[in-house]
Protein backbone atom coordinates (compact mmCIF):
# COMPACT_ATOMS: atom_id res chain seq x y z
CA UNK A 1 0.00 0.00 0.00
CA UNK A 2 1.46 3.35 -0.99
CA UNK A 3 1.43 5.91 1.79
CA UNK A 4 1.74 9.65 1.23
CA UNK A 5 2.91 12.16 3.81
CA UNK A 6 3.19 15.90 4.22
CA UNK A 7 -0.36 16.73 3.18
CA UNK A 8 0.10 20.50 2.92
CA UNK A 9 -2.56 23.15 2.81
CA UNK A 10 -2.34 26.08 0.45
CA UNK A 11 -1.92 28.56 3.31
CA UNK A 12 1.36 27.05 4.51
CA UNK A 13 2.71 25.59 1.25
CA UNK A 14 5.04 28.52 0.50
CA UNK A 15 6.32 28.76 4.08
CA UNK A 16 9.34 26.69 5.12
CA UNK A 17 7.02 23.72 5.71
CA UNK A 18 7.67 23.05 9.39
CA UNK A 19 5.41 20.80 11.38
CA UNK A 20 3.03 22.67 13.61
CA UNK A 21 2.74 19.83 16.08
CA UNK A 22 5.61 19.88 18.58
CA UNK A 23 5.57 16.12 19.17
CA UNK A 24 6.25 15.23 15.53
CA UNK A 25 9.79 15.30 14.13
CA UNK A 26 11.00 18.44 12.42
CA UNK A 27 10.33 18.58 8.68
CA UNK A 28 11.08 21.59 6.53
CA UNK A 29 11.98 22.88 3.09
CA UNK A 30 14.27 25.63 1.83
CA UNK A 31 14.02 28.58 -0.50
CA UNK A 32 16.89 28.86 -2.98
CA UNK A 33 16.46 31.73 -5.37
CA UNK A 34 12.81 31.82 -6.34
CA UNK A 35 12.19 28.10 -5.86
CA UNK A 36 11.24 26.13 -2.80
CA UNK A 37 12.63 22.59 -2.40
CA UNK A 38 10.99 19.93 -0.27
CA UNK A 39 10.93 16.15 0.20
CA UNK A 40 7.96 13.80 0.41
CA UNK A 41 8.23 10.22 1.59
CA UNK A 42 5.97 8.33 -0.82
CA UNK A 43 6.76 4.88 0.59
CA UNK A 44 7.55 4.18 4.25
CA UNK A 45 9.28 1.06 5.56
CA UNK A 46 7.05 -0.98 7.86
CA UNK A 47 9.26 -3.59 9.48
CA UNK A 48 12.52 -5.46 9.14
CA UNK A 49 14.46 -8.30 10.67
CA UNK A 50 17.62 -7.34 12.55
CA UNK A 51 20.77 -8.24 10.66
CA UNK A 52 23.07 -8.51 13.69
CA UNK A 53 26.70 -7.48 13.77
CA UNK A 54 27.89 -9.52 10.81
CA UNK A 55 28.39 -8.27 7.28
CA UNK A 56 27.00 -11.20 5.30
CA UNK A 57 23.43 -11.60 6.58
CA UNK A 58 21.58 -8.58 5.18
CA UNK A 59 17.90 -8.06 6.02
CA UNK A 60 16.65 -4.99 4.10
CA UNK A 61 13.79 -2.83 5.25
CA UNK A 62 10.47 -3.82 3.71
CA UNK A 63 9.11 -2.12 1.76
CA UNK A 64 12.00 0.01 0.56
CA UNK A 65 12.02 3.66 1.58
CA UNK A 66 11.28 5.98 -1.36
CA UNK A 67 11.36 9.79 -1.30
CA UNK A 68 10.23 12.28 -3.92
CA UNK A 69 11.54 15.80 -4.52
CA UNK A 70 8.98 18.56 -4.99
CA UNK A 71 9.97 21.99 -6.34
CA UNK A 72 7.54 24.92 -6.20
CA UNK A 73 7.55 28.46 -7.51
CA UNK A 74 6.48 31.66 -5.82
CA UNK A 75 2.88 31.16 -6.91
CA UNK A 76 2.83 27.65 -5.36
CA UNK A 77 2.87 25.96 -8.76
CA UNK A 78 4.93 22.79 -9.09
CA UNK A 79 7.92 22.94 -11.42
CA UNK A 80 7.75 20.38 -14.20
CA UNK A 81 10.25 17.52 -14.05
CA UNK A 82 11.48 18.26 -17.56
CA UNK A 83 12.44 21.80 -16.49
CA UNK A 84 14.84 20.59 -13.79
CA UNK A 85 18.34 19.17 -13.94
CA UNK A 86 18.44 16.33 -11.41
CA UNK A 87 22.02 15.26 -12.14
CA UNK A 88 23.52 16.61 -8.91
CA UNK A 89 20.69 16.10 -6.42
CA UNK A 90 21.12 13.47 -3.73
CA UNK A 91 19.49 12.49 -0.44
CA UNK A 92 21.32 11.24 2.64
CA UNK A 93 19.70 9.07 5.28
CA UNK A 94 20.46 8.26 8.91
CA UNK A 95 18.72 6.48 11.79
CA UNK A 96 16.78 8.24 14.53
CA UNK A 97 14.66 7.27 17.51
CA UNK A 98 10.95 6.59 17.25
CA UNK A 99 10.06 10.13 18.34
CA UNK A 100 12.57 11.71 15.94
CA UNK A 101 14.40 13.55 18.74
CA UNK A 102 17.61 11.55 19.09
CA UNK A 103 19.88 9.95 16.54
CA UNK A 104 20.74 6.26 16.93
CA UNK A 105 23.44 5.87 14.31
CA UNK A 106 25.96 4.09 16.57
CA UNK A 107 25.67 0.95 18.64
CA UNK A 108 28.18 -0.65 20.99
CA UNK A 109 29.75 -3.73 19.45
CA UNK A 110 29.22 -6.72 21.79
CA UNK A 111 32.75 -8.03 21.25
CA UNK A 112 34.27 -4.84 22.71
CA UNK A 113 32.61 -5.11 26.15
CA UNK A 114 35.36 -6.01 28.62
CA UNK A 115 34.56 -8.36 31.47
CA UNK A 116 34.69 -6.93 34.97
CA UNK A 117 37.73 -8.08 36.92
CA UNK A 118 36.84 -8.79 40.58
CA UNK A 119 39.16 -7.26 43.18
CA UNK A 120 40.00 -10.69 44.71
CA UNK A 121 41.32 -12.31 41.58
CA UNK A 122 44.09 -14.85 41.18
CA UNK A 123 47.75 -14.04 41.67
CA UNK A 124 48.46 -14.53 37.99
CA UNK A 125 45.95 -11.89 36.97
CA UNK A 126 47.28 -9.42 39.53
CA UNK A 127 50.81 -9.69 38.22
CA UNK A 128 49.74 -8.42 34.81
CA UNK A 129 48.87 -4.97 36.12
CA UNK A 130 51.97 -4.59 38.32
CA UNK A 131 55.65 -4.31 37.67
CA UNK A 132 57.55 -7.57 37.38
CA UNK A 133 60.87 -6.12 38.54
CA UNK A 134 62.91 -7.26 41.50
CA UNK A 135 62.41 -4.20 43.79
CA UNK A 136 58.71 -5.01 44.11
CA UNK A 137 59.35 -8.47 45.52
CA UNK A 138 61.73 -7.01 48.10
CA UNK A 139 59.38 -4.22 49.10
CA UNK A 140 58.02 -6.00 52.24
CA UNK A 141 61.60 -6.24 53.57
CA UNK A 142 61.83 -2.45 53.75
CA UNK A 143 58.87 -2.14 56.10
CA UNK A 144 59.63 -1.05 59.64
CA UNK A 145 58.62 -3.37 62.51
CA UNK A 146 56.54 -0.72 64.25
CA UNK A 147 54.62 0.97 61.49
CA UNK A 148 54.74 -1.71 58.84
CA UNK A 149 54.43 0.83 56.05
CA UNK A 150 56.77 1.67 53.23
CA UNK A 151 58.51 5.07 53.49
CA UNK A 152 57.12 7.72 51.20
CA UNK A 153 58.33 11.05 49.88
CA UNK A 154 56.83 12.89 52.83
CA UNK A 155 59.01 10.94 55.29
CA UNK A 156 62.26 12.29 53.75
CA UNK A 157 62.84 15.94 54.52
CA UNK A 158 64.57 18.15 51.95
CA UNK A 159 67.49 18.91 54.26
CA UNK A 160 68.05 15.35 55.37
CA UNK A 161 71.25 13.70 54.17
CA UNK A 162 70.51 10.62 52.07
CA UNK A 163 73.05 7.84 51.70
CA UNK A 164 74.59 7.78 48.22
CA UNK A 165 73.81 4.83 46.04
CA UNK A 166 76.52 2.48 44.77
CA UNK A 167 77.28 2.69 41.07
CA UNK A 168 76.41 -0.43 39.04
CA UNK A 169 79.30 -2.84 38.54
CA UNK A 170 81.18 -0.97 41.31
CA UNK A 171 82.55 -4.18 42.76
CA UNK A 172 85.85 -5.17 41.21
CA UNK A 173 86.41 -1.86 39.42
CA UNK A 174 89.19 0.42 40.62
CA UNK A 175 89.18 4.04 39.52
CA UNK A 176 92.64 4.72 38.13
CA UNK A 177 92.78 8.51 37.78
CA UNK A 178 90.43 9.91 40.41
CA UNK A 179 89.16 9.16 43.88
CA UNK A 180 85.49 8.64 44.55
CA UNK A 181 84.18 8.81 48.13
CA UNK A 182 83.28 5.38 49.36
CA UNK A 183 79.53 4.97 49.65
CA UNK A 184 78.11 2.97 52.57
CA UNK A 185 76.55 -0.33 51.75
CA UNK A 186 72.77 -0.09 51.43
CA UNK A 187 70.04 -2.61 50.92
CA UNK A 188 69.62 -4.15 47.47
CA UNK A 189 66.05 -2.95 47.34
CA UNK A 190 67.27 0.64 47.40
CA UNK A 191 69.82 0.27 44.62
CA UNK A 192 69.99 -1.07 41.15
CA UNK A 193 68.39 -4.33 40.09
CA UNK A 194 70.75 -7.26 39.88
CA UNK A 195 70.51 -7.41 36.09
CA UNK A 196 72.44 -5.10 33.79
CA UNK A 197 70.60 -2.63 31.54
CA UNK A 198 71.34 -4.75 28.46
CA UNK A 199 70.60 -8.21 29.81
CA UNK A 200 73.06 -10.97 30.72
CA UNK A 201 76.62 -10.59 29.54
CA UNK A 202 77.87 -12.97 26.90
CA UNK A 203 81.46 -13.36 25.79
CA UNK A 204 80.64 -13.76 22.11
CA UNK A 205 78.16 -10.84 21.96
CA UNK A 206 79.10 -7.45 20.60
CA UNK A 207 77.18 -5.78 23.45
CA UNK A 208 78.82 -7.69 26.32
CA UNK A 209 82.20 -7.33 27.96
CA UNK A 210 84.34 -9.92 29.75
CA UNK A 211 84.19 -9.80 33.55
CA UNK A 212 87.12 -8.07 35.29
CA UNK A 213 89.91 -10.33 36.57
CA UNK A 214 90.07 -10.92 40.33
CA UNK A 215 92.64 -9.19 42.44
CA UNK A 216 94.17 -5.73 42.36
CA UNK A 217 93.95 -4.39 38.84
CA UNK A 218 96.38 -1.55 39.54
CA UNK A 219 99.37 -3.89 39.76
CA UNK A 220 98.95 -5.96 36.64
CA UNK A 221 96.57 -4.43 34.11
CA UNK A 222 96.37 -6.19 30.73
CA UNK A 223 95.44 -4.47 27.53
CA UNK A 224 91.65 -3.99 27.56
CA UNK A 225 89.36 -5.58 25.02
CA UNK A 226 87.81 -2.68 23.18
CA UNK A 227 84.12 -2.87 22.21
CA UNK A 228 82.83 -3.23 18.68
CA UNK A 229 82.54 -0.20 16.43
CA UNK A 230 78.75 -0.60 16.49
CA UNK A 231 78.78 -0.31 20.26
CA UNK A 232 80.97 2.79 20.24
CA UNK A 233 78.82 4.31 17.49
CA UNK A 234 75.81 4.02 19.79
CA UNK A 235 77.63 5.40 22.83
CA UNK A 236 76.69 9.00 23.69
CA UNK A 237 80.01 9.65 25.41
CA UNK A 238 82.88 11.36 23.67
CA UNK A 239 85.06 12.27 26.64
CA UNK A 240 88.17 10.26 25.77
CA UNK A 241 88.00 10.50 21.99
CA UNK A 242 90.44 13.40 21.78
CA UNK A 243 93.12 11.41 23.57
CA UNK A 244 92.56 8.41 21.31
CA UNK A 245 92.92 10.50 18.18
CA UNK A 246 96.32 11.78 19.34
CA UNK A 247 97.74 8.31 19.97
CA UNK A 248 98.95 5.94 17.28
CA UNK A 249 96.20 3.49 16.46
CA UNK A 250 96.97 -0.15 17.35
CA UNK A 251 96.97 -2.68 14.57
CA UNK A 252 94.33 -4.78 16.33
CA UNK A 253 91.70 -2.07 15.97
CA UNK A 254 89.37 -2.80 13.02
CA UNK A 255 88.25 0.83 12.82
CA UNK A 256 89.62 4.34 12.81
CA UNK A 257 88.93 7.48 14.78
CA UNK A 258 85.60 9.23 14.65
CA UNK A 259 84.46 12.81 14.84
CA UNK A 260 83.46 14.18 18.23
CA UNK A 261 82.64 17.76 17.35
CA UNK A 262 79.04 17.59 18.59
CA UNK A 263 78.25 15.78 21.87
CA UNK A 264 75.52 13.18 21.76
CA UNK A 265 74.60 13.13 25.43
CA UNK A 266 73.10 15.82 27.67
CA UNK A 267 75.41 17.51 30.12
CA UNK A 268 75.28 16.06 33.57
CA UNK A 269 75.38 19.57 34.98
CA UNK A 270 71.83 20.11 33.76
CA UNK A 271 70.59 17.81 36.49
CA UNK A 272 70.20 19.21 39.97
CA UNK A 273 72.07 17.85 42.96
CA UNK A 274 68.91 16.30 44.30
CA UNK A 275 68.28 14.34 41.11
CA UNK A 276 71.77 12.97 40.39
CA UNK A 277 73.44 10.43 42.59
CA UNK A 278 76.75 11.60 44.11
CA UNK A 279 78.62 8.67 42.62
CA UNK A 280 77.22 9.45 39.18
CA UNK A 281 77.99 13.16 39.60
CA UNK A 282 81.59 12.48 40.59
CA UNK A 283 81.91 9.99 37.75
CA UNK A 284 80.64 12.54 35.24
CA UNK A 285 82.90 15.30 36.51
CA UNK A 286 85.93 13.14 35.88
CA UNK A 287 85.09 12.70 32.22
CA UNK A 288 85.45 16.31 31.08
CA UNK A 289 89.12 16.14 30.18
CA UNK A 290 88.68 19.09 27.82
CA UNK A 291 87.96 21.34 30.83
CA UNK A 292 90.98 23.60 31.50
CA UNK A 293 90.30 23.42 35.23
CA UNK A 294 91.66 19.87 35.49
CA UNK A 295 94.98 19.43 37.24
CA UNK A 296 97.83 17.33 35.97
CA UNK A 297 97.62 15.01 38.96
CA UNK A 298 94.23 13.75 37.77
CA UNK A 299 95.44 12.65 34.33
CA UNK A 300 95.10 8.97 33.60
CA UNK A 301 97.23 6.52 31.72
CA UNK A 302 96.33 5.32 28.20
CA UNK A 303 95.32 1.94 29.54
CA UNK A 304 93.05 3.42 32.18
CA UNK A 305 91.50 5.75 29.61
CA UNK A 306 90.78 2.85 27.26
CA UNK A 307 89.26 0.81 30.05
CA UNK A 308 87.32 3.82 31.23
CA UNK A 309 85.89 4.36 27.73
CA UNK A 310 84.91 0.71 27.42
CA UNK A 311 83.24 0.89 30.81
CA UNK A 312 81.36 4.12 30.26
CA UNK A 313 80.12 3.03 26.79
CA UNK A 314 78.20 0.23 28.44
CA UNK A 315 76.91 1.85 31.63
CA UNK A 316 77.31 5.62 31.76
CA UNK A 317 74.89 6.68 29.06
CA UNK A 318 72.20 4.64 30.72
CA UNK A 319 72.71 6.37 34.06
CA UNK A 320 72.95 9.80 32.44
CA UNK A 321 69.66 9.52 30.61
CA UNK A 322 67.96 7.53 33.37
CA UNK A 323 69.26 8.54 36.82
CA UNK A 324 69.28 5.86 39.47
CA UNK A 325 66.00 5.79 41.38
CA UNK A 326 66.34 6.68 45.03
CA UNK A 327 64.56 5.11 47.92
CA UNK A 328 61.97 7.88 48.08
CA UNK A 329 61.20 7.45 44.38
CA UNK A 330 60.77 3.68 44.42
CA UNK A 331 58.69 3.32 47.54
CA UNK A 332 55.60 5.27 46.38
CA UNK A 333 55.65 3.47 43.04
CA UNK A 334 55.65 0.11 44.80
CA UNK A 335 52.71 1.04 46.95
CA UNK A 336 50.75 2.54 44.09
CA UNK A 337 51.38 -0.46 41.85
CA UNK A 338 50.06 -2.82 44.50
CA UNK A 339 47.01 -0.63 44.93
CA UNK A 340 46.31 -0.16 41.24
CA UNK A 341 46.59 -3.86 40.55
CA UNK A 342 43.20 -4.45 42.18
CA UNK A 343 41.46 -1.84 40.00
CA UNK A 344 40.21 -3.17 36.63
CA UNK A 345 41.46 -1.30 33.55
CA UNK A 346 39.02 1.04 31.83
CA UNK A 347 36.93 -0.70 29.14
CA UNK A 348 37.75 -0.14 25.50
CA UNK A 349 34.47 0.34 23.69
CA UNK A 350 34.12 -0.11 19.96
CA UNK A 351 31.09 1.37 18.23
CA UNK A 352 29.71 0.41 14.87
CA UNK A 353 27.01 1.73 12.57
CA UNK A 354 23.47 0.75 13.43
CA UNK A 355 22.19 1.42 9.92
CA UNK A 356 23.93 -0.76 7.35
CA UNK A 357 23.91 -0.13 3.62
CA UNK A 358 24.27 2.84 1.25
CA UNK A 359 23.39 5.99 3.17
CA UNK A 360 22.86 8.18 0.10
CA UNK A 361 20.87 7.90 -3.10
CA UNK A 362 21.06 9.78 -6.38
CA UNK A 363 18.08 11.33 -8.05
CA UNK A 364 16.25 9.26 -10.68
CA UNK A 365 13.58 10.45 -13.06
CA UNK A 366 10.94 7.69 -12.90
CA UNK A 367 7.22 7.10 -13.27
CA UNK A 368 5.10 6.18 -10.30
CA UNK A 369 2.31 3.59 -10.26
CA UNK A 370 -0.06 6.20 -11.76
CA UNK A 371 2.26 6.90 -14.68
CA UNK A 372 3.19 10.35 -13.36
CA UNK A 373 6.83 11.44 -13.71
CA UNK A 374 8.83 12.57 -10.71
CA UNK A 375 12.29 12.82 -9.15
CA UNK A 376 12.66 9.82 -6.82
CA UNK A 377 15.31 8.66 -4.34
CA UNK A 378 15.34 4.94 -3.54
CA UNK A 379 16.84 3.22 -0.46
CA UNK A 380 16.34 -0.45 -1.25
CA UNK A 381 19.33 -1.94 0.65
CA UNK A 382 19.13 -0.60 4.20
CA UNK A 383 19.42 -2.91 7.21
CA UNK A 384 19.38 -2.34 10.97
CA UNK A 385 21.64 -4.28 13.33
CA UNK A 386 19.55 -4.20 16.50
CA UNK A 387 15.86 -4.55 17.25
CA UNK A 388 13.70 -1.62 18.23
CA UNK A 389 11.50 1.13 16.82
CA UNK A 390 13.16 3.75 14.63
CA UNK A 391 12.67 6.43 12.00
CA UNK A 392 14.72 7.43 8.98
CA UNK A 393 15.75 11.05 8.54
CA UNK A 394 16.26 12.15 4.93
CA UNK A 395 18.05 15.29 3.80
CA UNK A 396 18.13 16.77 0.30
CA UNK A 397 21.15 18.60 -1.11
CA UNK A 398 22.72 19.56 -4.42
CA UNK A 399 26.45 19.02 -5.01
CA UNK A 400 26.72 20.64 -8.43
CA UNK A 401 28.82 23.69 -9.19
CA UNK A 402 27.03 26.92 -10.13
CA UNK A 403 24.60 27.48 -11.76
CA UNK A 404 23.30 24.39 -9.91
CA UNK A 405 20.62 23.63 -8.93
CA UNK A 406 19.54 25.43 -12.06
CA UNK A 407 20.05 23.86 -15.47
CA UNK A 408 23.58 24.10 -16.84
CA UNK A 409 25.81 22.67 -14.09
CA UNK A 410 28.66 20.56 -15.48
CA UNK A 411 30.72 19.43 -12.48
CA UNK A 412 30.69 18.80 -8.76
CA UNK A 413 31.80 21.65 -6.52
CA UNK A 414 34.33 21.35 -3.68
CA UNK A 415 32.54 23.64 -1.25
CA UNK A 416 29.94 22.97 1.44
CA UNK A 417 26.50 22.04 0.13
CA UNK A 418 23.49 23.48 1.94
CA UNK A 419 20.68 21.19 3.05
CA UNK A 420 17.64 22.05 0.96
CA UNK A 421 15.01 19.92 2.72
CA UNK A 422 14.55 17.52 5.61
CA UNK A 423 11.89 14.94 6.36
CA UNK A 424 11.31 11.81 8.44
CA UNK A 425 9.68 8.51 7.68
CA UNK A 426 7.02 7.00 9.86
CA UNK A 427 7.94 4.63 12.65
CA UNK A 428 9.00 1.12 11.72
CA UNK A 429 9.89 -1.83 13.92
CA UNK A 430 12.94 -4.05 13.71
CA UNK A 431 12.37 -7.56 15.09
CA UNK A 432 14.64 -10.34 16.19
CA UNK A 433 14.76 -13.55 14.18
CA UNK A 434 12.25 -15.31 16.44
CA UNK A 435 9.76 -12.45 16.62
CA UNK A 436 9.85 -11.38 12.97
CA UNK A 437 6.30 -11.68 11.54
CA UNK A 438 7.43 -11.90 7.92
CA UNK A 439 8.06 -9.72 4.88
CA UNK A 440 5.07 -7.53 3.93
CA UNK A 441 3.45 -7.71 0.52
CA UNK A 442 5.03 -5.95 -2.41
CA UNK A 443 3.58 -2.51 -3.06
CA UNK A 444 2.39 -1.19 -6.41
CA UNK A 445 5.04 1.53 -6.35
CA UNK A 446 7.80 -1.05 -5.87
CA UNK A 447 6.47 -3.02 -8.82
CA UNK A 448 6.27 0.09 -10.99
CA UNK A 449 9.80 1.16 -10.11
CA UNK A 450 11.11 -2.37 -10.53
CA UNK A 451 9.73 -2.51 -14.04
CA UNK A 452 11.82 0.54 -14.90
CA UNK A 453 15.10 -1.15 -14.01
CA UNK A 454 15.31 -0.37 -10.29
CA UNK A 455 16.34 -3.31 -8.12
CA UNK A 456 13.84 -3.41 -5.28
CA UNK A 457 13.25 -6.36 -2.91
CA UNK A 458 10.00 -8.05 -3.90
CA UNK A 459 8.03 -10.68 -2.03
CA UNK A 460 8.13 -14.20 -3.48
CA UNK A 461 4.53 -15.24 -2.80
CA UNK A 462 2.09 -16.06 -5.59
CA UNK A 463 -0.02 -12.93 -5.19
CA UNK A 464 2.98 -10.62 -5.48
CA UNK A 465 4.24 -12.45 -8.56
CA UNK A 466 0.84 -12.07 -10.20
CA UNK A 467 0.84 -8.37 -9.40
CA UNK A 468 4.31 -8.02 -10.90
CA UNK A 469 3.28 -9.75 -14.13
CA UNK A 470 0.10 -7.70 -14.43
CA UNK A 471 1.96 -4.47 -13.79
CA UNK A 472 4.56 -5.41 -16.38
CA UNK A 473 1.91 -5.97 -19.05
CA UNK A 474 0.24 -2.66 -18.25
CA UNK A 475 3.61 -0.92 -18.27
CA UNK A 476 4.57 -2.29 -21.67
CA UNK A 477 1.19 -1.45 -23.18
CA UNK A 478 1.31 2.12 -21.92
CA UNK A 479 4.86 2.64 -23.16
CA UNK A 480 3.94 1.29 -26.62
CA UNK A 481 0.96 3.61 -26.82
CA UNK A 482 3.06 6.56 -25.65
CA UNK A 483 5.72 5.96 -28.31
CA UNK A 484 3.08 5.71 -31.09
CA UNK A 485 1.67 9.09 -30.19
Curated annotation (Swiss-Prot):
It comes from the Eukaryota. One of its GO terms (cellular component) is cytoplasm. Pfam families: Velvet. It is found in: Nucleus; Cytoplasm. InterPro entries: Velvet, Velvet_dom, Velvet_dom_sf. The keyword Hydrolase does not apply. Induction: Expression is down-regulated during fruiting body formation. Belongs to the velvet family. VelB subfamily. This is Velvet complex subunit B. It comes from Laccaria bicolor (strain S238N-H82 / ATCC MYA-4686) (Bicoloured deceiver).
Amino acid sequence: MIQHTNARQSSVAIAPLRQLVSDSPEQWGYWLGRKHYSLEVVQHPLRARMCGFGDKDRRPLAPAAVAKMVVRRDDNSIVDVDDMDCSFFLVTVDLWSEDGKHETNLVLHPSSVDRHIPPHSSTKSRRRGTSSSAPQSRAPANQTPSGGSTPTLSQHRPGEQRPPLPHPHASGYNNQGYVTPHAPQVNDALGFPPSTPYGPTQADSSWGYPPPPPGDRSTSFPHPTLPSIHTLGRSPSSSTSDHWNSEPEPQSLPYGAWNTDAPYHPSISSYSNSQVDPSVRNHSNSEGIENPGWSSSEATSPHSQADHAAYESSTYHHSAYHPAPTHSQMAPGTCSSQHVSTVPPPPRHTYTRTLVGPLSANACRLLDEHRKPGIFFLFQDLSVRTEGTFRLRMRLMNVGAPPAPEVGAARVHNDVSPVLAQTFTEQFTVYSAKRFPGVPDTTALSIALGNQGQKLPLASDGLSEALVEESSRVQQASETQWFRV
